[in-house]
Amino acid sequence: MKWLKEQAEKSPNKLFLNQLTFKEVYDKTVQTAQHLNKETARHNRLALLSENSPEMAIVLFALLALDKEVLLLNTHLTANEIREQLTELDVELLIASDQQTYPADLSFSDIYSLETSRAVLNWQPAPEKIAVIMNTSATTGKFKSVPITWKMLAAHVAASAATMGVLPEDNWLVVLPMFHVSGLSIIMRSLYNATQATICSSFDEEELIKLINNSSVNMVSMVPTMLKRVHEKIAAESLRVLLLGGEFIPQPLIQACFAQGLPVYKTYGMTETFSQSVTFNILEHPDKLTSVGQALPGVEIEILNPDAAQAGEIHLKSPMLMKGYLNQEDVQLFNTGDIGYLDEDNFLYILNRRKDIIISGGENIYPKEIEDLLYSLEGIVECALVPQEDQTWGQVPLLFYAGTPDVQEITSFLSQRLAKYKLPRQIIKMNALPKNASGKILRKNLKHEA
């Protein structure tokens, strides 16, 4: 939290969150902390449930200045899921924005009716102190809790700045959820860099296009499903950075963005590493478009158990890496669950998530390969290949898609380009594929459909 105090002193009138300056955010943070001090005194760990807003950031900053661990809850959770997460993590105090319907102990508007008390604020917490906790889904369906420490935050913002650079006029558009690393990392980078962040409550296609094309912002983070909808409508010259990650990125989308001159930084990271660990600008490396980039400063990549083609399990080690999931053993080398390889220039290539690989009759089928191919067929909006249990082959591929081509057209297209064992046994058309709050396709939901 020392960054907020420092920026308020060095650049008090510089815009930080939307139209609020660093000094205004600092003052509001101190005021909010004074209101929360008594009410939160006996709680080391609290939960925050809110859509994106400057107010959410200020309440979070206040809780962090009070030395609290803050569980950030996904606003798309059901009431039962929220209760489960609060119980599992021994959280007894929930603060929520006024827009949230789940019954909270305090709403944002309640905070300022609380009695104020002089709070001792910790602007320089210990590196190993937990700042926020984010719950991430696991292959078992049971969530895992990722403790994000100040050491992880500091390592990330410094490495990100060194990789993508910083300009005084930078203004990063926040359309990804701030309860997720993809959104929160933007706020923390902007805080560290003394630059502006423009927070939107959610992804609004028309608003995003307008803000980019009128040069209100020059940086934005998106996931592929978002970019696919807007890339043809945004002006490349208005952007300095377009950070793209969150799921596997269709190759035809990257090729289209490259042709358009969009400064796409493909990125690879996860909650456990507090966002990006690997990245690169596609315009600077046209021969590496299928890669996800090179390691950020301080990040080590190891490929374990490689096959004959040197593809194996991707492991990461870095100061941005969590020590371990809450209530589980520490990790020194993190198994990402992805399969990939490094080339001679240390660019990383992802073949697939290990858990998504389909093994049919002893043959490995990589869904990403088939999905990338299908995205090159005009009219395909989104698609996902998932396994279906089969008594003869063990598993067979099942394809879900949204778009204008019919099933017969897709069958014909794929059969001319793929080995027979890779062809989907069934193709199902949907209006839209299920997605989470960050826009990732929910493959586990599709597997249940299978």
Predicted regions and their residues:
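Conserved AMP-binding/adenylate-forming core of the ANL superfamily
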Residues: 5, 10-40, 47, 53, ...
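Conserved pre-ATP/AMP-binding loop-to-beta segment of ANL
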Residues: 13-15, 117-135, 142, 165-171
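Conserved AMP-binding A3 loop
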Residues: 22, 131-158
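Conserved AMP-binding/adenylation subdomain of ANL enzymes
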Residues: 154-171, 179-219
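Gly/Ser/Thr-rich phosphate-binding loop
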Residues: 219-222, 228-286, 300
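Conserved ATP/PPi-binding loop(s) of AMP-dependent carboxylate-activating enzymes
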Residues: 278, 294-298, 306-333, 363-365
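AMP-binding/adenylate-forming catalytic core of the ANL superfamily
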Residues: 318, 339-422
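AMP-binding/adenylate-forming catalytic domain of the ANL superfamily
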Residues: 419-441
